[in-house]
Design a protein with these regions (language model features):
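A charged, aromatic-enriched C-terminal amphipathic alpha-helix characteristic of glycosyltransferases
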Residues: 294-326
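C-terminal "capping" alpha-helix adjacent to the active site of nucleotide-linked donor transferases
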Residues: 280-298
Length: 335
């Protein structure tokens, strides 16, 4: 979510707008680890529950809004919002918008807060009609950051035959355990804690660490191949009903980085990337990776075609779309 937040901030800035950032992420981190010293020398959590942490993290926003008095407040994700605060802002003429990043996996949570925003921007339009019955909703595609995601030579430490950056959801772990990566230098990165040793041995950083988007992009540049594997979890449960239509951010970032990848079939993915092969089984994925490694010319041609397709998938374009939906874009007139 932080990467998406950074991208949207850059998008608004590149359009010439003044952007003030409320450091919600820092406050959430501090609130989750803060402890209070007791008279007996022991320590207790300053904010015992997740709800307490959220309340603390968001508590400084009203004061910030009073100082800044913006035309629009844009939340990214929005799971920590105070609905009453949003309604006060709307009553004072301040537009409220939310970039909802978890469609279609967590629609139930997102739909609960959607009515409190003037506009919601969805990363997948599968259930957009449900949102349109509650508020103004637009589909803003996943985007890349040209200063981060670009083609080039990577440092030797980041090079591999194949890379996958993401979270080790149970569905992904089960899939990857069935893949034959024998003889393939596989690099995994992201959140892979509590995964089997057969998976964890491929993680290229300390399991307790996280990697940022700059490191992710460097891994993409250093990989000969990659693949996209959608999760099947929603709110912690494995379900069959959360398949979406849109591509994920991984596909856009890989394409922008000029990296070939195998993919699972989805509506938008099939429209954008017919030049890249699809797989349905772990066995098929292994075969595709081996084919790509053995055919560098064909691999590079397909990667370049995919790169050209995503040229316009940028955050400034998304920011313009969101502001237009808020009624904050002046229409150009002739003469």
């Amino acid at each position: 979510v932080q990467d998406v937040f950074d991208g949207w901030c850059e998008g608004f800035t590149e359009l010439g707008h003044e952007v003030k950032q409320y450091n919600l992420g820092d406050r959430l981190t501090w609130g989750s680890v803060a402890h209070l010293g007791m008279d007996d020398g022991t320590y207790i959590k300053a904010f015992p529950t997740t709800r307490d942490v959220y309340s603390f993290a968001i508590s400084g926003l009203p004061q910030s809004v009073l100082y800044w008095w913006p035309q629009v407040i844009v939340f990214v994700s929005g799971f920590t919002v105070d609905p009453q605060f949003l309604e006060v802002c709307r009553g004072r003429g301040i537009k409220t918008a939310c970039v909802m990043t978890e469609s279609p996996y967590e629609e139930s949570r997102q739909l609960l807060i959607a009515p409190h925003f003037d506009v919601v921007a969805l990363n997948d339009p599968t259930n957009i009609n449900q949102y349109l019955s509650l508020t103004t909703a637009v589909y803003t595609p996943h985007a890349y950051r040209p200063a981060v995601h670009y083609e080039g030579e990577a440092h030797a430490d980041y090079q591999s035959d194949c890379v996958f950056v993401g979270t080790g959801y149970p569905s992904r772990v089960a899939f990857l355990e069935r893949c034959n990566f024998s003889g393939i230098d596989l690099a995994l990165a992201g959140n892979w804690q509590n995964t089997p040793a057969s998976i964890a041995e491929h993680v290229v950083h300390d399991l307790e660490d996280c990697i940022d988007n700059d490191q992710t992009a460097e891994l993409y540049r250093g990989a000969k191949t990659s693949f996209n594997l959608y999760r099947t979890e929603t709110n912690g449960d494995v379900v069959d009903g959360c398949d979406g239509w849109s591509v994920g951010p991984r596909e856009i970032e890989l394409a922008a980085s000029g990296t070939w990848f195998a993919r699972q079939s989805r509506g938008e993915s099939d429209e954008l990337f017919p030049m890249l092969p699809t797989f349905e089984s772990p066995e098929e994925l292994g075969e595709l990776i081996r084919w790509a490694l053995a055919n560098p010319v064909e691999r590079q041609i397909a990667a370049q075609q995919a790169k050209r397709v995503v040229t316009d998938r940028t955050f400034p374009n998304n920011a313009h779309m969101l502001l237009a939906a808020c009624g904050l874009v002046k229409e150009e007139t002739d003469g």
